[in-house]
């Protein structure tokens, strides 16, 4: 089995058919499709069950209770048997040649991870979400130098093939977070996975469609959700620091990932203050200074590697 496609499912009945069609109709047929039911309340799983009846490559796992995207995805990865893992969110979809192109880019399993470009999909229109020039690295140190000086950092867990044995070897640490994450779960997973990858390939092909879903947790601007997102980032930042203290992580991207996590968390805290009507003059001044300093730091990092 070349690739295991992991699809966590929760209340996506409007989109799941397009997601599953894009997985089932891949030009590369040597794949398995693992659907993990996170106990939603709509007809998503009824639709998934119908597809499973007609395709033996589809395997369905049901959580005992709602666990959230992060732990649900981990449940699917536990059961995977493919050489590589491809994470696919159930409201997104793939180019029909995604698996074939990405697997060919592994060079017969030489690369631990292959990353490809993605589109942002909104109202049946595609725009670039992330894209890469072709770049390959034969050591973690070589990758670390390049990654640290990259202007735009991609930490999505989707849009990649990741060697299953590397992913599964780190599941215990990831699952030990024991928290129902709705935000920042990709940051933690990629922080750990990057540390354990030595050979990495970035390709220019645009193979993933990331859908704007107004009902998703990431687009929920309520006070309660903002508080949950802040809590999630704080948990993830603490977990990254814990992992770094126990492992010899590359200092450059360790610093980069954690500082970006803190920056994103600070943005959410400002949004919460604005929502609560507590964003005063000193907050505005602080936000302006922090924003300018963030831009300066990024320019120094990209241009001089510091």
Q: Model-derived features: where do they sit?
A:
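A conserved acidic beta->alpha catalytic loop
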Residues: 22, 37-46, 65
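Short aromatic/hydrophobic "clamp" motif used to bind/position activated sugar donors
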Residues: 85
